[in-house]
């Protein structure tokens, strides 16, 4: 699951679905700031806990630990969980810079050999967090995060991309009509195919 204000309406409707057997679902969140306390309002895990993870009876809920002492080990731990529970569905958004999860243009790699990695957040991404009222100032936005990589997201059987806000219009346009390139990481979604269909 993506954690962003753009997902609020979707998540609020999803938790009321009578057609989903939540007890069969292993839930994951796809990115987390490094250095943010897990119960801080800005924590993506906390965001999802409040909006969905604590509202329905998942089989398991798996969190990235942005406060892990050894971030490489945390990436390995979460990667092993993803391999143990292959992803059926990814629900994601698109950032103003075209990112998916925290795969900003400078760190996006369509052929990444990792499932989870540490990334440096670009200034557009960090400013978006301020504009969306997640942080008061740019300097309060962490400079680094953990994220599922693009290949990890594309392993899903189904992908749902929810982008309701006007401030994302340019990113959506570039995704749909621009070059498929790591300069607009979301553009890779145009090549996504599902074996499950």
Identify the residue ranges that each predicted region occupies.
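Short beta-strand segments
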Residues: 2-4, 29, 64-65, 91-94, ...
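Glycine-rich anion-binding loop/nest that anchors nucleotide
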Residues: 91-93, 139-174
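Ligand-binding beta-strand-loop-alpha-helix segment within the catalytic cores
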Residues: 21-91
């Amino acid at each position: 699951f993506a954690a962003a204000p753009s997902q609020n309406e979707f998540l609020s409707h999803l938790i009321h679905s009578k057609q989903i057997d939540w007890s069969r679902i292993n839930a994951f969140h796809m990115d987390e700031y490094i250095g943010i306390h897990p119960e801080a309002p800005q924590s993506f895990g906390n965001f999802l806990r409040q909006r969905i993870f604590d509202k329905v009876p998942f089989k398991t809920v798996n969190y990235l630990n942005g406060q892990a002492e050894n971030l490489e080990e945390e990436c390995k731990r979460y990667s092993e969980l993803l391999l143990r529970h292959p992803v059926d569905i990814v629900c994601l958004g698109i950032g103003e810079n075209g990112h998916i999860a925290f795969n900003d243009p400078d760190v996006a790699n369509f052929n990444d050999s990792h499932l989870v990695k540490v990334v440096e957040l670009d200034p557009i991404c960090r400013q978006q967090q301020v504009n969306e009222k997640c942080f008061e100032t740019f300097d309060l936005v962490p400079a680094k995060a953990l994220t599922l990589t693009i290949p990890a997201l594309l392993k899903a059987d189904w992908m749902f991309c929810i982008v309701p806000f006007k401030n994302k219009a340019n990113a959506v346009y570039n995704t749909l009509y621009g070059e498929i390139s790591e300069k607009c990481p979301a553009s890779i979604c145009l090549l996504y195919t599902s074996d499950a269909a």
